[in-house]
Amino acid sequence: MNYSAMIQNRKSVRAFRGKEVPNEALAQLRTYYEKTCPRLVPEIATELIVLDKDAQPALESSAGYQQFLIGAPHYLLLMSARHIHAGVNAGYMMEDLVLKLTELDIDTCWLTFTDSDKIKKALSLTTPLQVAAIVAFGYGEKTAKKLRMNIQSMSQIDVQAEQQYYAPKKSVHELVHMESWSNKSGLDEMMDFYDDMLWQAFYAASLSP
């Protein structure tokens, strides 16, 4: 996988089409999880569960930001054994799986949850492992404009989308301030240009979902 390209290409989708992901792609995802997906703490037991749209009613009562759940044709649950580093390990693994889905031209959206037991009960899961991460995935709604990132270059070129069903990424100029909020004076001079390590560090931060 070309991680740099996938990190730049990925986007967090807020509206999915009803089209289901082909079984072949789902099989590739499972194989990747079993054989390739890196673990920060290999000794932590994990399990990957792929759900279809039929799971949405159960998830609506147990997951989502302030009980608002993103509807999708599929949901990915990463289960984990209890461990002091379970959250970090699961986050690392799921983000890698998100990049794999991006490589397969499949869109994703992380979902918020606070109660693993509530989700397990809603889905009738009997595994002793805990819900550690949830991602909705499928094919995002098509928009009139394909431009995705609102990343402003050092030469002030701004790329924007007029209509979108995804969360746009922030430009370096939107993220970075000089000594006080909203002060951009001297920002370009401080970071020099694209090969400047400071600019590259801020650009990397701007690629987060």
Placement of each model-derived feature along the sequence:
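Acidic, surface-exposed loops and disordered segments
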Residues: 1-209
